[in-house]
């Protein structure tokens, strides 16, 4: 059954699927092609007639994941240039005032799309939510800092998508005044950035941060260095005008080289002392440009930004095992390597003993995975919560602790494992969660997200600095936990991240 809705740019034709109206590939901006590859998003050109919105659009250009991780996180690739589009699942286009949830996908700002099978919005629509997902520009195209182009184009795309929601979602039954924006990993970092920038103020009422916070921003001087190296390797000037003529495949090749070098052992002769010293973890990420961002998002939030936005935040128990376990590196990590990492991170060598004492690792590889889980994910998220103690809006915390049986159980409750539980798409993620994950846990997690988007209350007490209580999701029992892993949390007090 076909359904036609009039948007601000023209009519779109969706389809009725199991009682839910679904619209795919609706443009929220013009395709970023040719001379417009690096420009700010432009409003979609109005069209005559009815535009088909029954199939997903192209996905943003991105390289493949490393093989070991790509076997777990399956990506959908759809070729084409018209990829600044969004998708809508609605229980009833004729309804009035339904809560809206807008999903921002993760992928280190270089991978992912809004059309991945695990992000199917049908379960949210079945529970009375108008669900929206979208694509945004990634990698060099979205985040390389160039003097003749706006910075943070990927973020500008996200804002443009949210503005489309504000202007059009009532036509799909949604309430533009009750929007929850949520994301995972780089998507959660994006949400935190949107909370921090005045440009997005008023576009959403609630936010959910899944495994990402507000400390991943690139300093302007580092962004300039990265752009210069990219251009040098491509044999062009470090400008948008020059890079607009470089084939996308070449951009992606250099993008992969740059990411591997910066995340490995960057040569100071190439990258300078700052980047070689670890100033950049994600080379393509929000840039502190003085316009969209004047400081790191975490600092802006500590100063009061986004304090009127209800917040649900959390992490998985074993985040970093996704990046260590599949590669086979865990058994080869030595105690000396752990000690060196602790020293570089500003912690004493004895910190490793605290991780073992709290049951967070016996072997060096397991200890390192827990240390980096805290360093990159858990502690930055907790600092966001701590900075909102006096906020008028409420803050809620969670920990996702269910351990996947995949790879003989060595992944644990790794990064991204909660996604099919949030979306109730367990059958789309067997590579990550196996063939018999607990559906009851998916129902529990998903329902909490729906409750939060509907009312601002996921169903458990708000986070506070006295108890630091969070909901620990696990099977067969999910329960409130007071101050998880307090000793290792305290190790990071005062340590810059």
Swiss-Prot record:
The keyword Hydrolase applies. Optimum pH is 6 with cyclic PET trimers as substrate (at 60 degrees Celsius). Its main location: secreted. Optimum temperature is 60 degrees Celsius with cyclic PET trimers as substrate. Its EC number is 3.1.1.1. Keywords: Hydrolase, Secreted, Serine esterase. The active site is at 185 (acyl-ester intermediate), 319 (charge relay system), 415 (charge relay system). Belongs to the type-B carboxylesterase/lipase family. This is Carboxylesterase. The lineage of its organism: Bacteria, Bacillati, Actinomycetota, Actinomycetes, Streptosporangiales.
């Amino acid at each position: 059954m076909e359904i036609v809705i009039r948007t601000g740019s023209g009519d779109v034709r969706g389809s009725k699927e199991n009682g839910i109206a679904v619209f795919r590939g609706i443009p929220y901006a013009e395709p970023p092609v040719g001379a417009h590859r690096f420009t700010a998003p432009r409003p979609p050109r109005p069209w005559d007639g009815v535009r088909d919105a029954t199939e997903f659009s192209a996905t943003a250009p991105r390289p493949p994941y490393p093989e070991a991780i790509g076997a777990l996180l399956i990506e959908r690739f759809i070729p084409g240039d018209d990829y600044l589009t969004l998708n809508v699942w609605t229980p009833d286009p004729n309804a009035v005032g339904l809560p809206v949830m807008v999903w921002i996908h993760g992928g280190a700002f270089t991978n992912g799309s809004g059309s991945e099978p695990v992000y199917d919005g049908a379960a949210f629509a079945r529970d009375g939510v108008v669900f929206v997902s979208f694509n945004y520009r990634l990698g060099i195209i979205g985040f390389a800092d160039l003097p003749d182009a706006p910075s943070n184009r990927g973020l500008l795309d996200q804002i443009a998508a949210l503005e489309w929601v504000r202007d059009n979602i009532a036509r799909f039954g949604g309430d533009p005044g009750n929007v929850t924006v949520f994301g995972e990993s780089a998507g959660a970092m994006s949400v935190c950035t949107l909370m921090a920038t005045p440009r997005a103020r008023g576009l959403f009422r609630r936010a959910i941060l899944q495994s990402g916070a507000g400390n991943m921003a690139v300093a302007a001087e580092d962004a300039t260095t990265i752009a210069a190296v990219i251009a040098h390797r491509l044999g062009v000037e470090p400008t948008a005008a020059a890079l607009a003529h470089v084939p996308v495949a070449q951009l992606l090749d250099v993008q992969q080289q740059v990411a591997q070098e910066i995340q490995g052992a960057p040569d100071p002769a190439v990258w300078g002392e700052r980047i070689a010293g670890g100033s950049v973890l994600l080379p393509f990420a929000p840039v502190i440009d003085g316009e969209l961002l004047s400081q790191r998002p975490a600092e802006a939030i500590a100063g009061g930004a986004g304090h009127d936005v209800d917040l649900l935040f959390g992490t998985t128990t074993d985040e970093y095992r996704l990046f260590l376990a599949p590669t086979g590196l865990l058994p080869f990590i030595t105690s000396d390597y752990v000690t060196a990492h602790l020293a570089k991170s500003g912690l004493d060598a004895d910190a490793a003993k605290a991780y073992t004492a709290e049951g967070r690792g016996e072997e060096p590889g397991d200890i390192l995975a827990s240390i980096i889980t805290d360093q990159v994910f858990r502690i930055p998220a907790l600092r966001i919560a701590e900075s909102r103690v006096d906020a008028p809006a409420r803050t809620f915390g969670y920990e996702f602790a269910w351990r996947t049986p995949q790879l003989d159980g060595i992944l644990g409750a790794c990064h991204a494992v909660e996604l099919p539980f949030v979306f109730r798409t367990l059958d789309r993620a067997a590579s990550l969660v196996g063939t018999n994950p607990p559906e009851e846990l998916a129902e529990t997690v998903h329902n909490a997200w729906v409750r939060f988007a509907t009312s601002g209350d996921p169903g458990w007490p708000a986070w506070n600095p006295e108890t630091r209580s969070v909901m620990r999701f696990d099977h067969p029992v999910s329960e409130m936990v007071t101050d998880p892993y307090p000793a290792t949390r305290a190790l990071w007090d005062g340590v810059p991240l």
